[in-house]
Regions:
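A conserved beta-strand-loop-helix scaffold within acyl/acetyltransferase catalytic domains
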Residues: 42-89
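Acyl-donor-binding surface of acyltransferase catalytic domains
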Residues: 1-23, 127, 139-144
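Glycine-/small-residue-rich active-site loops that bind phosphorylated ligands and cofactors
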Residues: 92-93, 122
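Short amphipathic alpha-helix that is part of the acyltransferase structural core
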Residues: 12-46
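Conserved GNAT acetyl-CoA-binding A-motif
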Residues: 108-120
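Conserved acetyl-CoA-binding loop-helix of GNAT-fold acetyltransferases
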Residues: 87, 93-106, 127-128, 132
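Conserved active-site alpha-helix within GNAT-family acetyltransferase domains
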Residues: 121-139
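Catalytic phosphate/metal-binding cores of nucleic-acid and nucleotide-processing enzymes, i.e., regions
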Residues: 79, 112, 138-143
Length: 144
């Protein structure tokens, strides 16, 4: 696992028309969560109740949409952590992942100078995307 950070002065920020902040789209969010759970088995996957708690405490959810349907997301927590990046496999590519991260970064950069994330060792694709838009690796750490 690696700790990565991004400073707004180093970031490649953008605004994609396919990215928006969550606005009470609970039914569509549940649909994509259900799809996620059929293709990925992950113990830390959140559900609607967790999403409601996170949003209530001030965390933000940014959505990737295609054909007016949620097809991906990234959470940005009040701790300045970017977390839970996901793009539906049908739409998974560097551009869509980059758009999610850079659009969320653009929005939070208005209030924050720096933000961070963890990237798992197996997720080299996420690291390539993040590095390509200005994120820097701070430290690698491993379980063993």
């Amino acid at each position: 696992m690696a700790l990565v950070t991004c400073h707004r002065d180093d970031a490649i920020l953008g605004q994609s028309t396919n990215i928006s902040e969550f606005k009470d789209e609970w039914e569509d969010l549940q649909r994509e969560i259900d799809h996620y759970n059929t293709i990925i088995k992950w113990d830390e996957m959140w559900d609607i109740e967790t999403a409601k708690r996170w949003l209530k405490r001030g965390d933000r959810l940014f959505l990737f949409k295609q054909e007016n349907k949620i097809q991906g997301w990234i959470w940005v927590f009040t701790t300045k952590e970017f977390r839970h990046l996901y793009v539906n496999p049908q739409y998974r590519n560097v551009k869509n992942a980059r758009d999610l991260i850079s659009t969320a970064g653009y929005i939070v950069s208005k209030n924050w100078a720096k933000w961070w994330a963890h990237i798992d060792d197996w997720n080299l694709g996420a690291w390539w995307v993040a590095r390509g838009i200005g994120w820097k690796k701070v430290i690698d750490f491993h379980d063993n």
